[in-house]
Amino acid sequence: ELLAATGTGVAHCPVSNMKLSSGIARIPEMLRMGVKTGLAVDGSASNDGSNMLEEMRVAYLLHRLNSSSEAPSGYDILKMASRGSASILGREELGHLAEGMAADFFAISLDRIELVGGQYDPKSLLSCIGFKGAVDYTVVNGKVVVEQGRLVNVEEEKIVSRANAAVEKLLYIK
C-alpha cells in the first residue's frame, strides 16, 4: 500500500531473484494496488544472461506457477517491460510507439517454426511463447542498429574476441 501511495516504482527481476534465492515478488498484488511496476534483468552479477526477452517469459511463467489465475497476462508482462519500465525511470517518451516519441523498437519474423500461431496474439507472444536468439531488426532513436540479426555499426567477431581475451585475463590473474 505504501509503494502505491508514494508512487514508488518496483523493478521486477525474476531471474535474478531465482538465482539469488531471494523470493518471488508479489507482482500480482502490486499490479492490483496500482504500484508502478517494470521489468529488468538486474545485472551480470545476479543474472548471467541479461536477456530481457527471457526475463519476460520467466516472469510470465513464474507468476502463473505461483499465482495461477491472479497472474499477470502475457500482455501485462509486455506492458511492464515497456511502458512500466519507462515510467519507473521517469521516461514517459519511451516505452511505446507514437509520433514524437523515441523510435526504439525491435522486430522479429514470425516465419519460424517455434513461433507458429504467434500472429494470433502478438501482444502476448514474447511472454507466452518466448523468443530465443537474435532479433531480426533493432531500431534505436530512429536508427537501425541490428539488421538481419547482426549489429550494423560494429564487427561482432572482434568484440567477442576482445571480450573473451579480457575474461581470460581476469580469470587467470596470478
Residue positions per predicted region:
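Active-site core of metal-dependent hydrolases
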Residues: 1-49
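Short, solvent-exposed cationic patches
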Residues: 160-174
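C-terminal cap of metal-dependent C-N hydrolases
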Residues: 102-160
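His/Asp/Glu-enriched, well-ordered alpha-helical/loop segment
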Residues: 28-112, 128-130
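Short, positively charged
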Residues: 74-76, 111-119, 172-174
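Conserved strand-to-helix beginnings and helix N-cap segments that scaffold or border functional pockets
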Residues: 23-24, 49-53, 119, 157
